[in-house]
Amino acid sequence: MKNFLFLVTLYCEVLCMLASCGKDDDNPVPEPEINRFVLFGKTYPAFTVFVSKEVLGKGNYDIYVYPAEDNTIELGLQCSMQHDGMSLDLTKYDPLNAVPGYSGWMWYISVEKTEEGKEEYLLEGWGGDAPTMGILGVAGDILYIKSLNKDHTQFEIRCKLTDPEKRSLVFYYKGNVTLATE
């Protein structure tokens, strides 16, 4: 009888240990990113991403995003191909400013609204080092552009920008893009 009680107690202890340790996950698997375009708190679930083929030939990325539900809005993301795969801190001037003699593209982000032939900049950021021209973001703002293949038809793009007026953009995309001719 003592052996039976001992085995039942041991069995219960093992079950309790398994139940308490079963879901203690110190290294959870991160949720996969989903494609999203959020401008000033409004989510645009469907959008199209274009990359300028002509500008690729000059060593730069010129990317345009158009929400399906609002054809008046255009998101523009630009930077040198030298930034490919780099996470740029948008609170700082473009690191290529420090390269002697560099005259290529700096990072640039814009959101434009075009109605009745009139363009209005809703949000803008630029990594130039001229005090009157640099429009930097706030802590945590980044631009990350990575071409995922040699022919530049697949990209991973991440952008978060908040301007001095606290207007914000959050954009993430990983997938195929359309190569556009100007």
Kindly label every feature range from the protein language model:
Residues 58-62, 151-157:
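Short, hydrophobic/aromatic-rich segments at coil-to-beta transitions
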Residues 55-146:
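Surface-exposed helix/loop patches within compact recognition domains
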Residues 141, 156-182:
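Edge beta-strand at a domain terminus
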Residues 26-32, 143-152:
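N-terminal helix-cap/turn-to-beta initiation motif at the start of protein domains
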Residues 1-20:
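Sec-dependent bacterial lipoprotein signal peptides
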Residues 16-45, 181:
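Bacterial Sec-dependent N-terminal signal peptides
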Residues 32-53, 57-59, 124-127:
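Tryptophan-anchored aromatic micro-motifs
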Residues 43, 79-81, 92-94, 149, ...:
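A mature extracytoplasmic/lumenal domain signature
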